């Protein structure tokens, strides 16, 4: 058996300055609910999640935290005071199915309105 090495102490993490956006986003979460019956919903949810992470990396994004509704595609901002802001809903949209999905930039712009 190989000898065990010593653990090194972790260096102190540098304190980062918290800008206005991070303070507003503290405790907020973006939830994307999409139907799992078809892969198209999952692809659009992944693309939207990636766009939101690029725009606001400090904001956590959850995809389907609970069982989604059939035919649903919704994006919701959950604030720290337990209020919900609907950024996009495609439940009553369609057919055609492509009307259910937003352009990622539309949702990012809507999110910016609520974070500023």
Swiss-Prot record:
Gene3D superfamilies: Glutaredoxin (3.40.30.10). It comes from the Eukaryota. It holds the Pfam family Rdx. The modification N6-acetyllysine is found at residue 20. There is a cross-link at residues 35-38 (Cysteinyl-selenocysteine (Cys-Sec)). The keyword Nucleus does not apply. InterPro entries: Selenoprotein_Rdx-typ, SelWTH-like, Thioredoxin-like_sf. Keywords: Acetylation, Redox-active center, Selenocysteine. Signal peptide: none annotated. Belongs to the SelWTH family. NCBIfam families: CXXU_selWTH (TIGR02174). May be involved in a redox-related process. This is Selenoprotein H. It comes from Mus musculus. The gene is Selenoh.
């Amino acid at each position: 058996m190989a000898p065990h090495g010593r653990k090194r102490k972790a260096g102190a993490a540098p304190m980062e300055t918290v800008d206005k956006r991070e303070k507003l986003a503290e405790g907020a979460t973006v939830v994307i609910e999409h139907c799992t019956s078809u892969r198209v919903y999952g692809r659009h949810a992944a693309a939207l999640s990636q766009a939101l992470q690029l725009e606001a990396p400090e904001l956590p994004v959850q995809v389907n935290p609970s069982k989604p509704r059939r035919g649903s595609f919704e994006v919701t901002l959950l604030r720290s005071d337990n209020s919900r802001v609907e950024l996009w809903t495609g439940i009553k949209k369609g057919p055609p199915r492509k009307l259910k999905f937003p352009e990622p930039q539309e949702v990012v712009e809507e999110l910016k309105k609520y974070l500023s």
